[in-house]
A protein has these predicted regions:
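Short, solvent-exposed helix-loop connector elements
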Residues: 710-716, 821-835
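Conserved catalytic motifs of ABC-family nucleotide-binding domains
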Residues: 794-829
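Active-site-adjacent bridging/hinge elements
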Residues: 34, 95-102, 129-135, 316-320, ...
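Conserved ATP-driven helicase/translocase motor core recognized via long
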Residues: 25, 50, 186-359, 465-467, ...
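Conserved helicase/translocase P-loop NTPase motor core
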Residues: 120-127, 338-390, 403-407, 411, ...
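Conserved motor-region signature of P-loop NTPase helicases/translocases
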Residues: 1-66, 70, 142, 146-150, ...
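Conserved ATP-dependent motor core of P-loop NTPases, especially the RecA-like helicase ATPase domain
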Residues: 12-19, 59, 72-275, 279, ...
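Phosphate-interacting basic helix/loop segments used at nucleotide- and nucleic-acid interfaces
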Residues: 682-687, 828-843
Length: 900
């Protein structure tokens, strides 16, 4: 049977004799192409050790390896005719003879027996193996350990504390004066992550000032002296009583001016003057222009008199002119403090890691890159590798960072030089999709994808070779209705920001599809809290978010109860809970409310896809118990433990214990031993073991011997199991890294907020709720997107790299000096482009049914939105209208095939 067009395209892309750069749409079967290409390389006689496949995640590497071993295992057991048919599907030019069949059957054993096995691994795993293979050349211990994010964070904090205590207190104090206790660890992490950009720190004040366009010798004192003249303090003093007699706006200005000491002004006084004398960012007169003829009000200006009004306008103009200089000076001071700290911190951080024989994830890439570029050993290392790598495959190339690309490029130098250790033809295969690049926060740079494609094409052409550039347009996942919506929701300006031109074709063109757009739930008046003691961030039942969550849960319940059917390639079947995937952009209140609403409807639900260990109730209950065991005088910890499912005392029981007690809560509990015998039996046993058991053993004793796990799960549900298990894992990790003690374990837990990724439930019949990032690579028959209202993701990065320049400490958007504004605008534009790509990923998870909803502000022609760009909801609505969607009778739209 002749292959269809989609399969022919996959066969062409998997040709092992041609270097290929493949752009693959969502659902187009790129993993199949990768697996086919490796299988064809093995069939051609390439040794497994000469193939290297680099993936983005360990999960992707595992999936690909499992698929490949499954296929090779099946080949080993198939009869001749069936094996010939399977090999024909790979696109082999000739029918395989008996020897080829025997070779295919031996591939499974050959791959299993190869030392090291098939090399399908992440770039970090490869770099780690490279460093272990050449420890002397790379200058690392052959037995180095890899620091996970948590251990690295703890080590950085240890370095900062020791620097502050003795080795370099001035650098820490200077940075701490400009930062907070929350931003210091983040700054240290970003400095470590961007160490290559910090290798030549800007510690010279002149360099920092030149970076921000400041004249040499410019200082804050000089600027203040030129801006606030000797007579200005008296001028403002005369102005204040006139303002107090004026309008409400004048009176507010008087209050702000009254607290200023203009006889000896500082930078904060100048900032306060700007707030009174200058317009804001969006004024018609211009951003931060002087309020000439607008301040004070007309009556107050008349009372002020012409001479003093002229003096006031002169002060306004000087403050206007001083603002960019003030911002530049502050930015220069912050950046100088940043680089002074980095110059002291990075060497000490590296020294501590070396003393422990440890490397963090960034070290793996940096050290491997350095090893492959060292003039004295690089050629030797490349020669040895050249004898080991003939074919390099790169998966998810759009999410590969520039530093990782540098390593990949060095590995393939000989591929494009026409020379090498052997005469075998070498190839590189790269697959990715710019439209799905959504991990910039992990270092991915979408522009590098096109740059490296051009680089390889040029280098191969220079070596009389070629790079085949192909695109997979057929989707094996989604119906044509879904794909048409994807194409139409991205207008021409949006498509231009997504990279190369694209289109989507459904492989199963007859499979029906359906898209629903629910009417948005817009914000109304804020509901007043029902009880004064409710938390300030409690979501009201009438909040748009809560209302939408209930609507989503009710709709799923109704679909399941009425036996709704979904189309499949083999015909329709009843919908079950496992067919439903709910995707949100972030773990906001909507995320939690949807889970709560689904539980209220008694829907089988997997819970959150990720959990923060410190926020889990079961973990907090166990933490309170441990805190009490460490310090019996800690009444709050004991009260929390008693009210938890571990002991299940009621509010009344706790009140009877605590009210009017003369001593500690523990003393009160001992005095009422006859009322709570089980509680005291458990606590006495655990207290007796506190000085003898390690943290893991003590927590496990509470969970198993005293039935703590069963009690927690009975009260909190099975999803609490992940948090409990991770707490035990953290106890073991702590014991491996330090001398175990309960006090140290509590400190370990509270130092960093551990995030745990739950195992996917794609094979179970439960509703899944997760972020779009977490759903990358997943699919579902019914996808619900409730989080499509306007949202401007915050820029959480504290460092900013100027175009072609060094790293600076990013100021707030409103405080950006001219030299920084362009870089910040470029970053904001890049974030908007990534938002479009995130929407693309969300839409393309759906196989046949998509529901879109929104709660909150939208961006339309007549409304304002925080980021000034269309919300996802508006883009999708425009796409549905362009595709011919019809009103559903409830204020929404529906787009569906006639066969639905």
């Amino acid at each position: 049977m002749r292959p269809d067009a989609a399969s022919l395209r996959q066969i062409e892309a998997s040709d092992p004799g041609v270097s290929t750069w493949l752009s693959a749409n969502a659902g187009s079967g790129k993993t199949r192409v990768l697996t086919d290409r490796v299988a064809r390389l093995l069939l051609n006689g390439t040794a497994p050790a000469h193939i290297l496949c680099l993936t983005y995640t360990k999960a992707a590497a595992t999936e690909m390896q499992n698929r490949l071993f499954q296929r090779l295992g099946e080949w080993a057991m198939l009869a001749d005719d069936r094996l010939r048919a399977e090999l024909a599907k790979l696109g082999l030019d000739e029918s395989p003879d008996d020897e080829a069949l025997r070779r295919a059957r031996r591939l499974f054993a050959h791959a299993i027996e190869t030392p090291g096995g098939l090399r399908i691994q992440t770039i970090h795993s490869f770099c780690a193996s490279l460093l272990r293979r050449f420890p002397l050349e790379s200058g690392v211990s052959p037995n180095f350990v890899e620091l996970d994010d948590r251990a690295a964070a703890l080590l950085r904090e240890e370095v900062i504390e020791d620097m502050a205590a003795g080795s370099n207190p001035l650098a820490v104090a200077r940075l701490a004066a400009l930062a907070t206790d929350q931003t210091m660890p983040v700054l240290a992490a970003e400095i470590a992550r961007n160490r290559l950009a910090m290798t030549r720190p800007l510690t010279d004040p002149g360099d920092c000032r030149a970076l921000f366009g400041l004249p040499r010798g410019e200082t804050m004192a000089g600027l203040l002296g030129r801006t606030v003249l000797p007579g200005d303090a008296a001028l403002v003093a005369d102005l204040i009583p006139l303002l107090r007699a004026g309008s409400a706006a004048d009176q507010g200005a008087a209050d702000r001016l009254a607290g200023l000491a203009l006889d000896a002004p500082d930078a904060e006084a100048l900032r306060a003057l700007e707030g009174v004398l200058l317009y804001g960012k969006t004024a018609k007169a211009g951003p931060y222009a002087a309020k000439i003829d607008a301040f004070p009000t007309k009556a107050t200006r008349a009372a002020l008199g012409e001479p003093r009004l002229a003096a006031l306008e002169g002060l306004m103009r000087r403050v206007e002119a001083a603002r960019p200089l003030r911002l530049s000076l502050l930015a220069a001071d912050r950046t100088e403090a940043l680089h002074a700290f980095a110059a002291a911190f990075l060497p000490e951080y590296d020294r501590r890691k070396e003393a422990r024989g440890a490397l963090d994830f960034d070290d793996l890439i940096a050290r491997a890159r350095h090893l492959l570029t060292k003039s004295d050993v690089a050629q030797w290392v490349l020669y040895r590798l050249d004898g080991g790598i003939d074919h390099l495959l790169v998966d998810e190339a759009q999410d590969t960072s520039p530093d990782q690309w540098a390593v990949i490029r060095l590995l393939t130098e000989e591929f494009t030089a026409g020379l090498g250790a052997r005469d075998e033809r070498r190839t590189i295969f790269v697959v990715g999709d710019v439209k799905q690049s959504i991990y910039s926060f992990q270092g991915a740079d979408v522009s590098t994808f096109a740059a490296m494609r051009a680089d390889y094409a040029g280098r191969l052409a220079a070596a009389d070779d070629r790079l085949a550039q192909m695109t997979l347009e057929h989707s094996f996942r989604s119906s044509q209705t879904i794909l048409d919506l994807v194409d139409r929701s991205l207008d021409e300006p949006a498509r231009a920001q997504m990279g190369d031109p694209f289109r989507h074709i459904a492989f199963r063109d007859r499979m029906p599809g359906r898209v629903e757009l629910w009417p948005p739930i817009l914000p109304g008046e804020s509901a007043k809290p029902e009880n004064w003691y409710d938390p300030v961030d409690l979501v009201s039942a009438e909040d748009p978010v809560a209302r939408l969550a209930r609507e989503v849960a009710r709709r799923i319940r109704a679909l399941l109860d009425e036996g709704a059917r979904i189309p499949t390639p083999d015909g329709s079947r009843p919908l079950h809970a496992g067919d439903v995937l709910i995707l949100v952009r972030r773990r906001s209140p909507l995320f939690s409310e949807i889970i709560r609403a689904c539980k209220a409807e008694r829907l089988p639900i997997a819970g959150a896809d990720r959990l923060k260990l410190g926020a889990e109730l079961a973990v907090r209950d166990l933490g309170s118990l441990v805190a009490f065991l460490v310090t019996p005088e800690d009444d709050l910890a004991l009260a929390e433990a008693l009210r938890s499912p571990l002991f299940a005392l009621s509010e009344g029981d706790l009140f009877d214990l605590a009210q009017g007690r003369p001593g500690t809560l523990w003393d009160a509990l001992l005095a009422q031993a006859d009322r709570h015998p089980r509680v005291l039996a458990v606590l006495h046993d655990l207290r007796a073991q506190t000085d003898f058991l390690r943290p893991f053993d003590l927590v496990e004793r509470a969970l198993t011997r005293h039935e703590g796990r069963a009690r927690l799960l009975a009260r909190l549900g099975p999803e609490a199991e992940d948090g409990i298990d991770e707490l035990l894992s953290q106890a073991l990790a702590y014991e491996r890294s330090d001398v175990p003690s309960l006090t140290g374990f509590l400190s370990w837990l509270h130092t960093d907020d551990v995030e745990v990724k739950r195992q996917g439930e794609s094979g179970g019949q439960v509703v899944r709720v997760m972020t779009v990032h977490g759903a990358k690579g997943l699919e579902a028959p019914l996808v619900i997107l409730p989080d499509t209202a306007d949202y401007a993701p915050p820029d959480r990065e504290l460092l900013l790299r100027l175009d072609g320049g060094p790293m600076i400490w990013k100021p707030r958007a409103d405080d950006a000096p001219p030299a920084v504004a362009a870089a910040q605008a470029a970053r904001a534009a890049a974030q908007e482009r990534e938002s479009l790509r995130l929407m693309y990923v969300a839409l393309t998870r759906a196989q046949s049914w998509l529901i879109v909803a929104a709660a909150g502000k939208l961006k339309s022609e007549t409304s304002d939105a925080p980021n000034g760009r269309p919300a996802w909801y508006d883009r999708i609505r425009a796409g549905m209208e362009a595709a011919g969607a019809r009103p559903d009778g409830d204020g929404g739209l529906v787009l569906r095939d006639e066969a639905w």
